[in-house]
């Protein structure tokens, strides 16, 4: 079966730049990679075809030979040069596949924030801090205890027994990665012997057993600013896990979680609460005290107030942590129906009900609803 033109395989023009070639190849590699298409022979063949095309066209000398003589110019069996599999001037597939694998798995190779071998940054930590509403609104100082990894003191974080030191890994030569040949291309992976550090411990420290770090719990003081809310994060720089091989320490992120309040519900900078009132206060009007985070305030209830009526107390909400004026407190009225009535109270209510008969002006919503019901059944 005749081979397809390499430019056609990659879907580019003959005069395409190196960047365009790389972009086209990366797109095809992502699409047809075996990890994305398990047990798909067609995709596997397309992947190999794209790999072969890119290895030729990304090498200046091979590309020149191909442009002049076609496949014969690069096929060793026909006297062409090079072949495939990575001579010194071959394509740098490790860079491309590093990008491809990053897209597959959501991160770079080697993990942890370090480079190839050598020092690596310590991991960041997360601590969930529970606060009540008053603490979140006003701010507070809290001591927390966090389990973490710190540098081993006897070996000063090297992992090697005192008087000795780590040695260069003979498997990877101190790089921390090894190259694996897979068909037409080679990829790099973490060295299985040194686990990416580039060095090995021949005489490990007795305290940390060669790890260079030990577990320890630290007590830290956290200053919580006023106005924080659930999901807000406070970063404590350098309070995460210690790095390895002398790498920098990670950070600690304190994540705020505000517990539910018995009276108030919070929505951003505004607070909400339900205010129960008697039906007599609702009908006749009155004045009552309602709670706020700053103490009690008087709320005037106009006569004829209905359940669901909302009263706004301006500035009685929360001042946001990122600045701006305080929000409001929204008071939702809930009219209570009296229970456990005495005989005299029932008599008075009966008299009151009788006095309302045939006078719909006292209950405009109810009269309108009943009129709607009558029209509904009249239309059936």
Swiss-Prot record:
The protein's required cofactors: Zn(2+)
One cellular component (GO) term of this entry: cytoplasm
Main location: cytoplasm
Domain of life (superkingdom): Bacteria
UniProt keyword Glycosyltransferase, yes or no: no
Signal peptide interval: none
Intervals holding CXXCXGXG motif repeats: 152-159, 169-176, 191-198, 205-212
Residue spans, zinc finger CR-type: 139-217
Family under the similarity heading: Belongs to the DnaJ family.
Listed name of the protein: Chaperone protein DnaJ
